[in-house]
Amino acid sequence: MAGVTPQLIKELREMTGAGMMDCKNALNETNGDLDKAVQALREAGLGKAAKKAGNVAAEGLISVLVNSDNTKAVLLELNSQTDFVAKNENFVNLTKEITTHALNNGIADAQTLASSKINGEEFQTYLNEKIATIGENLVARKLSLVSGQVVNGYVHATGRVGVVLAATCNDAVKDKAAALLRNIAMHASAMKPTVISYKDLDPAFVESENKAIRAEIEAENDELRRLGKPQKRIPEFVSKSQLTDEAIAAAKARFEDELKAQGKPEKIWANIIPGQIERFIADNTQLDGRFALLSQPYVMDDKKTVEQAIAEVDSSIVITEYIRFELGEGIEKKEEDFAAEVAKQMGK
């Protein structure tokens, strides 16, 4: 078996919450492939949806800057080596200066930033001077420039998460749309959607999660059954992308058959079936609520979705772009081999 180490087992446990032996077996079955082991556990109903936060190891700050008329915004991730430096006033000011430079000069990404000039000198020369002053290696790792009819953003007070959104709308409601986008950006910083709409979800991902979510609920039902508590419905689907007209029609026909079998008068079916259809859709779109921004319960009022909250402000508002940075996302932890490091330093 390739690469099945105690460290890997520990990491899989932290990612999924599954038991040690279950994690070990899953890694053995997948030849040490962490991602495949996570999916194997989920499909067996043994692990929760994994977040790859365990692989994140970076310090620094996320910065968001929006221009005065809410038509452009820059999102920047500036990394340092330690949290101590990230809280340093010089580092905070540096982050603001780079973000302002990017916004004022229409710099769209980190590569363009690296080749730009700031305060009359090459960006890397400028950054090297700051490195010498601050005393740690610094990296402007990610940068995005967002433009649109209306744009707004939010950065969490800790500087570890930032979100920028763009939308189209009627000119008359632009100010309302800008205020709404800030609130939705705040929502997205906490709820971590990966796409704007369920329509943006990859079909292969939907199919994979269909099995995994069913397995999760079946595992929960085993425990509820043991405790003598009501069990959850097992969904047929997990996303609106799977809910064809035929699927909804089949559900409606099934509800009609059930009401008929229960002896309910046909004249009251019209009062009952719409609620059943609504519940059917909610039960069968759980994936959308996890990953699609518009389908998520709105944190400002969880009785409505983000999509419904937008419609209440004005039906002309349409979100067209969504970018979320989380500090260190995608950076792998460095595994230290202290024996090898000592041997290297001793020239062995």
Swiss-Prot record:
Q: Where in the cell is it found?
A: Cytoplasm
Q: In the UniProt record, what gene is named as encoding this protein?
A: tsf
Q: Which SUPFAM superfamilies match?
A: Elongation factor Ts (EF-Ts), dimerisation domain (SSF54713), UBA-like (SSF46934)
What GO CC terms are in its UniProt record?
cytoplasm
- Annotated region described as Involved in Mg(2+) ion dislocation from EF-Tu, given as residue ranges: 82-85
| Family the entry assigns | Belongs to the EF-Ts family.
The name of this protein is: Elongation factor Ts
Q: Which residues form a coiled coil?
A: none
**Which organism is this protein's natural source?**
Aliarcobacter butzleri (strain RM4018)
